């Protein structure tokens, strides 16, 4: 890393949690990510979900076709864990270059209706993953209607994650997009096979952002933004230098008319300015010197992959993202649309 008061050069980062959708929208969102990141973990929650090595390989080719010419970018593919994903698919997936499977509790978030209804139904597949070295990526929320929305992550740790870890002590688990002090503390105290990703929006905002001046649907995501005490705990974890925490945007594009709706979709689109938003969060915390580890070093180490060899440079320079991007036949409104950002990617 090299830095001055107004510029910062770091090893090219990776995004360890990304949604790019499919079809025509790929042509908008993939270039945004490829401009900043060397690699990205691609979420499998399409309709239908990506549940086979063959589907993952085909999806990867569609993503690569949307990467601008001359840009080096590698999508890292995942499978969607279901109650009946066969264990023998894991070996095929590993041989095809798939790196992980994603656990969505059924009903927890966008396109999660095919998700897991009972973790015990997946145990044979998880055993195969532990043996093959595939990672388990976890959306860590319970979905019981009697559990308060803001408590679902903390309850998941006690009811699901602790027993899961006890059964599979050497399965590498990424607790994705953590949002609470309880999650940060759990990961900090867990063994070397547990890590977590943190989004830029959960570092920058608490739940007040959803309600400032009225309902602001573009700040609505799952897991939902939490109290300020939780945001502060996430900032402390991200800027601590611990290799258990690394960058995962959870950038989740939706057509604007489905966000700005009576029952709007969950998800914040941040890929257009992701590394700039992380720089802002780390700068706010007085920890720009910790950004490279979080963005470029800890993730590859946990996944057992080499670091990227290139660099990116950020400059302290105010700029304003556009109000929207084309998204197939719809419009995509990014987080911070029309609002000034203090850091800009320049190389």
Swiss-Prot record:
The modification N6-carboxylysine is found at residue 102. Its cofactor is Zn(2+). Coiled coil: none annotated. Its EC number is 3.5.2.3. Binds 2 Zn(2+) ions per subunit. Gene3D superfamilies: Metal-dependent hydrolases. SUPFAM superfamilies: Metallo-dependent hydrolases. GO terms for molecular function: dihydroorotase activity; zinc ion binding. The active site is at 250. Zn(2+) 1 binds at residues 17, 19, 102, 250. CDD domains: DHOase. Catalyzes the reversible cyclization of carbamoyl aspartate to dihydroorotate. HAMAP family: PyrC_classII. NCBIfam families: pyrC_dimer (TIGR00856). This is Dihydroorotase.
